Amino acid sequence: MAEDKTKRLGRWYFGGVAGAMAACCTHPLDLLKVQLQTQQQGKLTIGQLSLKIYKNDGILAFYNGVSASVLRQLTYSTTRFGIYETVKKQLPQDQPLPFYQKALLAGFAGACGGMVGTPGDLVNVRMQNDSKLPLEQRRNYKHALDGLVRITREEGFMKMFNGATMATSRAILMTIGQLSFYDQIKQTLISSGVAEDNLQTHFASSISAASVATVMTQPLDVMKTRMMNAAPGEFKGILDCFMFTAKLGPMGFFKGFIPAWARLAPHTVLTFIFFEQLRLKFGYAPPVKA
């Protein structure tokens, strides 16, 4: 009897690999999002900013910090996908998990992933934002590992976890928005008979999950980016950063929303499509019940 490949299970590291592959595709959009969020006055549109980066530093400047982006996915996404998928497999499989259980599991996985991924996230934000700084203020990290070493040497080990609370809070919401909503939407489409477990279903589920995740995380994403890119002593803490952002008006919390969605939507779609293809091609059959 031929194996039903749609029943295959993913391996714990597939999420990190899929996230890193997606990051390589969407990094320019992530860079634009970060630079828009760190503007103090919000003078440049996404088109103007793109043109400025191209004129000043060339086309390759859109890939500044790509090594840090890949490092972040290999730590952050490997952890959250690994925990979510591994624990989900240990739960009773006789019926689908209720959504609240998926959300709780995704929140826990996101918290772990956010903490583990903070150093890579910090280097990622700094490298992406470097090109907009004056020459004398640029950090000029050669690559992600150089950034980690220099931060530890020049600013201390704990500096690598600057903004960890914000990053972890965002990761919780992001993982709930992405993993649990993706799972639920995909399950609903398939179980209702509207769709099959195929590429079209993966696309529809992932783009819906990306929209939910963007709305949930954008305010925290803006504050996280500001705190990670801040000079020493610029913000006393999360509340200080919140008050600073609030002074810019309600939309200050949604700076860069369009590029954030434009980046997160394709990144989420690619991540889940890569993940599902890895599962179908290289996953393993579920154990047979005795």
Curated annotation (Swiss-Prot):
It is a multi-pass membrane protein. The keyword Transferase does not apply. GO terms for biological process: lipid transport; malate transmembrane transport; oxaloacetate transport; phosphate ion transmembrane transport; succinate transmembrane transport; sulfate transmembrane transport; thiosulfate transport. Its main location: mitochondrion. GO terms for molecular function: antiporter activity; malate transmembrane transporter activity; oxaloacetate transmembrane transporter activity; succinate transmembrane transporter activity; sulfate transmembrane transporter activity; thiosulfate transmembrane transporter activity. Keywords: Acetylation, Antiport, Lipid transport, Membrane, Mitochondrion, Mitochondrion inner membrane, Repeat, Transmembrane, Transmembrane helix, Transport. Coiled coil: none annotated. Solcar repeats lie at residues 6-90, 101-188, 197-281. One of its GO terms (cellular component) is mitochondrial inner membrane. Gene3D superfamilies: Mitochondrial carrier domain. The chain crosses the membrane at residues 12-32, 65-84, 103-123, 163-182, 203-223, 256-276. Disulfide bonds: none annotated. It is found in: Mitochondrion inner membrane. Pfam families: Mito_carr. SUPFAM superfamilies: Mitochondrial carrier. The modification N6-acetyllysine is found at K159. It catalyses: (S)-malate(in) + phosphate(out) = (S)-malate(out) + phosphate(in); malonate(out) + (S)-malate(in) = malonate(in) + (S)-malate(out); (S)-malate(in) + succinate(out) = (S)-malate(out) + succinate(in); (S)-malate(in) + sulfate(out) = (S)-malate(out) + sulfate(in). Belongs to the mitochondrial carrier (TC 2.A.29) family. PANTHER family: MITOCHONDRIAL DICARBOXYLATE CARRIER-RELATED. Catalyzes the electroneutral exchange or flux of physiologically important metabolites such as dicarboxylates (malonate, malate, succinate), inorganic sulfur-containing anions, and phosphate, across mitochondrial inner membrane. Plays an important role in gluconeogenesis, fatty acid metabolism, urea synthesis, and sulfur metabolism, by supplying the substrates for the different metabolic processes. This is Mitochondrial dicarboxylate carrier. The gene is slc-25a10.
